[in-house]
Amino acid sequence: LVLGPKLYLEDRIRLYSLIWDEVEEFTQLLRTLLNALSSLGYAENAYCPLSALIPRETSIIDVNTLEGVNDPKSAPLDIVTPKGIRTSLPRSVIAALVAELTIVMEEKPAKYFDYTDLLDFPGYRSRYKFDDVRKELKKTGMLKEMFLRGKVAYLFQRYSAENELTSMLLCIGPSNQEVQDLPGVINSWIAVTH
């Protein structure tokens, strides 16, 4: 994978597609996301208007916005990089790319916010264990579900590995949860951070 960044875009996509046995839906998703990053000059940060968050139904932080990630007709949103590169990308693509969102508050409700970041990992679920991924991807919404599970797991692992999570509040609703591997994930976090 060291070779990947040195390759032209399509060659890089072909190389990475070997990881998932060249499943076309995953390859197309990677192509969509890499093209979006390319249009931003591969910037690590970008700015977007408040309309990126409201209304809630189309917010880039609402996991349901990922539904149209491979749909080029998804509602566009204008964004700009710190270097002034401006582009318009589908909200679903921005939702897929965003790892962290910084919201500046005019008035802080408590001093706690001077030294605390709040991270939310929505939709944390157990990973799927499929015998035939291609068959499962034919089901409506399955690409979004697989991407969401992978993204949330990746972000949690990344923040844990970089010791950016120092405290945790675990909220679980009263219904049956589909997170059989959650105890192991929490134990790993405790072992790494404490």
Q: For the regions a protein language model found, what residue spans apply to each?
A:
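Globular "head" domains of long coiled-coil molecular machines
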Residues: 1-194
